[in-house]
Amino acid sequence: MARSQAGGGRRVDWFAAGLGLVLAVVIRLVGETLLFPNHRSQLVSQGLLIFGALLAGGFLAGLVGPIGGATWNGIIVAVGFIVVAELAAAIGPVGPLGSAGLDTLGLVIDDVLILSGGTIGGLAAGLVRRRTAR
């Protein structure tokens, strides 16, 4: 567990981050199933769906966890989402042609999109909680 500099309180709440991760994965799976049945069309729309899922997951993690660690909880949700997505992709096609769809630019863009969504969601939750605490 990470400790804060001043008060010694927890910054990362793993339960909150886990809830946010589950929410983000469920939103992505349900959204892609309902909106994109052929999996390879409308890449921009799929990116927006993933970004929205991470915003929601990061926001939930920021609301449930400690107020000082809202942003960190959002980041943990995003990193966990990347790990889950890569593990799911690893289960996919295997063999010499199985990884032909991997490109470095696409991977970087996906990861930046995911990390931005989780971080912004956590930041937004922290701002909301600080305003309501006043």
Go through each PLM region and give its residues.
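Juxtamembrane/disordered regions of integral membrane proteins
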Residues: 1-134
